[in-house]
Regions:
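Hydrophobic transmembrane alpha-helices and their helix-loop junctions in integral membrane proteins
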Residues: 2-166
């Protein structure tokens, strides 16, 4: 979060990059809060804090360590989806992205492409046993991905700056 905000606000002499850096900071804080809250709720529900044991290292959920209901999985899963959406700049957390590309081109492209998008995807893959417990949650993830793809395509059509379109 800090690195992204500082990178976006790299040209700090102008007000626009600084304002966008604050937006990035806020989005990442919401994402971090959702991830922390999901971990706290999951620990409260299961009494387990070790993700390797909790997720059963690839064994079908629930492994022998913890059982959660479909409704509990939905609550924890929604928090995890919010965390992943914030990290990967999915809708509704993607509004800052077209304006954030005022930073240095190579570093902003590498940093965002190599880290941010992959953080959200890795998180969802890592907690996929929880997501699989709730069909509604799977539809939410698919819907967010679809809406984000359409939004990105429409945004790219009207952008005049190449970096903003990417």
């Amino acid at each position: 979060g800090v690195s992204s905000a500082l990178l976006v606000a790299f040209f700090h002499e102008r007000t626009s990059p600084v304002r966008n850096g604050v937006r990035v900071w806020a989005v990442y804080r919401v994402s971090d809060a959702a991830l922390l809250l999901a971990a706290v709720v999951l620990h409260h529900l299961t009494g387990q804090g070790d993700f390797d044991k909790l997720l059963g290292l690839g064994q079908p959920w629930p492994s022998g360590h913890a059982e959660i209901s479909q409704q509990q999985a939905l609550i924890v899963g929604l928090l995890l989806v919010v965390a992943a959406a914030g990290k990967s700049a999915l809708v509704p957390f993607s509004g800052w992205l077209p304006r954030a590309m005022e930073g240095p081109t190579p570093s902003s492209a590498v940093f965002y492409g190599a880290l941010s998008v992959h953080l959200g995807a890795f998180l969802l893959l890592r907690v996929s046993p929880i997501l699989a417990l709730s069909p509604v949650l799977c539809l939410v993830v698919i819907g967010l991905g679809l809406i984000t793809a359409v939004y990105a395509a429409l945004t790219a059509r009207v952008q005049t700056d190449v970096k903003s379109a990417l």
